[in-house]
Amino acid sequence: MASPIQLPAGNPGPLTGAGNNTWLIDGAEPTLVDAGVGLAPHVDAIAAALGGRALARVLVTHGHADHASGIDALRARWPDLDARKLVQDTDRGWRDLRDEHRIAAGDAELVAIHTPGHAPDHLCFWDADARALYAGDMLALGTTVMIPAGRGGDLRQYLASLDRLAALGPLVAYPGHGPVIDRPLDLIREYIAHRAMREQQVLACLQEGVTDPDAIVAKIYGELVDPVRRAARMTIDAHLEKIRQEST
């Protein structure tokens, strides 16, 4: 089975790295995983890859703007587009996807895997035949995933989602940011160990009487500038919330 085509969304930045990935799964029902942000060069690149055929479907991993906001531009190019995500109360114009729903994609079949933690509506898409995972914002090489406490992020859910992905035994992962991940199980184990290490650092701060979240960020990370500092603060808040949840 052919690998998906990586089509960058063209939105580099401090929190998106080189920018978002979208993944075109070609075949009988051409399917795009994630919608990007609607930039014209990205939409044109999708059309060029399709060679005049219509894009049949878009599967969005979660509702964050860098993954979902391009849907209007895609619909403008392909009006009959089947757009799907895990629908929340404020979502409009999407067909709903739920955990373990099966969806045709190219010549393959994907299974939606609900993986909350980074976002409550986060889905990964699993190609069991290829043992390939479309990972969204669950995994990314060379960095860790932000857990945005107060904006739907939940560290306990994220760790449980990592365990669920590990149980699938993926051989390759196609992430929402960064290059293809050739050893996703190793990365999942590294992420779990990293979160355990970070929790121990937070606990050490609390035991030393450092309880202000901004002070904890400064002690653990050193000097950061926004927006990276805000991202670190949200993740520290997620660790503090996990500690509170598990102490009651």
Predicted segments — roles?
Residues 40-84:
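Active-site metal-binding motif and surrounding structural segment of the metallo-beta-lactamase
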Residues 46, 177, 202, 243:
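Residue-level signal for inorganic ion chemistry
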Residues 61-67, 118, 177, 239:
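Histidine-centered divalent metal-coordination motifs
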Residues 83-89, 93-95:
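Glycine/small-residue-rich loop that forms an oxyanion/phosphate-binding "nest" at active or ligand-binding sites
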Residues 1-51, 124-136:
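Conserved beta-strand hairpin/beta-sheet module of binuclear metal-dependent hydrolase folds
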Residues 62, 115, 244:
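Short, contiguous alpha-helical
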Residues 204-248:
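C-terminal regulatory/interaction regions
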Residues 30-32, 37-39, 109-201:
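Metallo-beta-lactamase
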